[in-house]
Amino acid sequence: YGLVGSEMCIRDRATYKNASLPAEERAGLLLKELTLEEKVSLMMDSSKPVERLGIKPYNWWNEALHGVARAGLATVFPQPIGMAASFSPETVYEVFTAVSDEARAKNAYYTSQESHERYQGLTMWTPTVNIYRDPRWGRGIETYGEDPYLTSRMGVMVVKGLQGTNDGKYDKLHACAKHFAVHSGPEWNRHEFNAENIKPRDLYETYLPPFEALVKEGKVKEVMCAYNRFEGDPCCGSDRLLMQILRDEWGFDGIVLSDCGAIADFYRDYGHKTHPDAESASAAAVLSGTDLECGSSYEALVEAVKQGKIDEKAVDVAVKRLLTARFALGEMDE
């Protein structure tokens, strides 16, 4: 038994199971063990388990707009538009530090019960840093107002409060800047609206500054791409937004995820209809840098690879980012 135990310990130290290795290295080691079908199953909000490798189910969709949402009793703070009226970034930091404490505690409880449902995880799809330009937009209360500077200051503090100081073994939580970009209502046509003829000055002085601040100052771990189109391309398939601006200009190296159903908008009749089917839409989204889908269109990625619409190496890039985040949060460990 001693020899067998020693061999197992040595083997584990050289694999993704070794918790002393950096998260990115562990992700790379685990990636090598996965089949294409298993990789794809990890790329949607309700991530499937891979039992043969000890990967648990995980739900990426969790909410904390002004308190831990939909996960039982929690402290309810004012809506973001109300917190913005305080003009106190320090207060917002304290609020979301408390929110992250509660979220971590709730996750620990649910995990102890072997429950991995939506709203029980560690990846919070908050904050909303879109600009509240038109008071007729019903979801304007989720924003920090009409001013890009104030929105930036508040948003950075939301992220820092949620993600914590990162001085422990694992990250506390991962926050998400949404909805990228040029997304300020109305709701009724967001699945087909095309934001075009946006003047460069308006883009860079109004719509983009909060996201840039959250990436560069806040070190936000996730960015959610919006439903609408930008200059003809769905935001979740926009090379301009997701590759040129977000990753190349700003240096973002985290996860890009879609709003819920946004990939299906690429091809369904009441959406953008920029792509003929789920295979083409999913391939385009991943190639543009959308790592994670809230929805189920990414199931078509297996067939898309077989059809030559996308190389499996592009899938690997996305999956490695997802696994790195899960290791960094400690979610993959006991």
Kindly label every feature range from the protein language model.
Residues 1-3:
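A short, hydrophobic C-terminal helix/tail in secreted or cell-surface proteins
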Residues 6-7, 11-334:
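Glycoside hydrolase catalytic-domain context in secreted enzymes
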